[in-house]
Amino acid sequence: MNSFDKLLTKPTSEIQEDVKGLFEKFNLRDNPFPSEPFVNKDANDDRINGKIFEMEIRKKEYEQMVNNFLKIPRNDPSHLRMGFIMDTSYIGRGNGKSAFLINLHRKINEGFALDISNNINKSFSVYLSPEPGGRTKTFSQLIDLFFKSILDSSIIKNCLAAIRLDALLSLTPDFNPSKHFKDESDLIEKLNSTEWLNENKINPGMLNKKILENKYLISLPKEFPLYEIQGSLLTPEVVTQDHFKEHYLNLKKGQERLEFIFSHLVDFFLAANFNGAFVLVDDFERIPDFQSARQKRDFALELRNCLYDGLYKNAKMGFYTFILVLHAGVPRLIQEAWSDSGMENRVPITPSRTITKHIIPFEKLNREHAVSLLKRYLSEYRIKDNEKRGRNDELFPFTEEAVYKIAEVSELNASKILKLSYDLLDKASTINEQEKIDEKFVEEIIDKNIMDSETKKSIASAETTDLLKKAQGD
């Protein structure tokens, strides 16, 4: 072989060009189900970040949320300041509460609840989940997490842009936003930029002076970021969300931070034309699970003080509505503290015949819900429209009977249904002749898994011989 042969010689085994993707025979570009069905709001994979969600299976719960909370005028003194999404299925974790909450959070923020409430309310949503292992045990720690979630949502940045636009239109009535901004995101970025304002001959100092004439901002302390960071008329700068973060971190834990969150920020949000906010607290049990009886009572007392009976602006008007997700058993954990602190009189943790609007029962799914759930996931990963296959094509390659079986063995638990569907589809993709997933295939795979599991247990528990001791004659 000369020096050029290796460049021109072809291998004897050629690559097959007509090879199909692993799930292509099922008209899918990938396995649409999550391999580990745990929800992570910030993940890039839509299978686990909650974006693939069939709201129809939680239509009842969503309508209760809309009618009991989102549509009630915030100026109604009896509007609810706290609510519970309470698991009544008793099937353990994985009933879809987190996915529901994340989608509710996104739905509220899409139109700031203006569309949902027919312009009665303008509210934003903040989603948070207490840290595991007892790291969110005190009310102060929860509030730190709450403010972090506010920052992550960029709602302060949004409000700063809204307040500046309002002031700019007052100072310059002929200012046309559509000529300067491509869309909402562009507007928010530019109105939070000192450089852009200067380039367009808009003095940030004069703009800030106009902003501070807002009736909700006049009473704020002079340490509040809008007052503290103004810049001079010669070297002006805009206040950014980072200034709010720095200000909060410089406040002492306890009263100073509570005053900022439940009074000063409320006035700031009101100045940006919001009249309410929903604080969605997932996995609430992570807090009382690690609290002593006294810590539970102190936590409930502070909650009552900030939401109902204290002197904070929020307690007076009910700007924030806290929605707590409670797994089965959590009410029993906090019932005594709720009663001792007086919270039971404000927002009963125990359902009654007369006061139930603040409690949204989260019930077990049924077989039809399981069918709708699988259809939703499958539709997100279709390679092409497949209407010609017939009425039940949306479920392909699953049959309806197969889904009923999956739901049955999964105890109607959403996470288990999705995980089993993932495993079945993954297995079927490796069997050339397996063109569909029917009830028989489901039973065969389940039986095989049970046998494999029992074999592993048998091996693990089998009597063993210590060969070293045997060789030594022991």
Kindly give the residue locations of the regions a language model identified:
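A short, basic N-terminal segment
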Residues: M1-G83, N176, K440-D474
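C-terminal alpha-helical "lid" subdomain
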Residues: N2-K6, K364-S372, L378-D474
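The catalytic "switch" region of P-loop NTPases
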Residues: N2-P34, K60-Q64, I229, L233, ...
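Charge-rich, solvent-exposed alpha-helical interaction surfaces
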Residues: D18, L22, M65-N68, L142-L145, ...
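Short, well-ordered amphipathic alpha-helices
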Residues: Q64-L70, I102-E110, L303-Y308
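P-loop NTPase nucleotide-binding core
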Residues: N75-N273, T465-L468
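Glycine- and acidic
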Residues: G83-M86, E285-Q291, K405-A407
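A short acidic (Asp/Glu
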Residues: G94-I102, K137-I143, P288-R294, P331-W338, ...
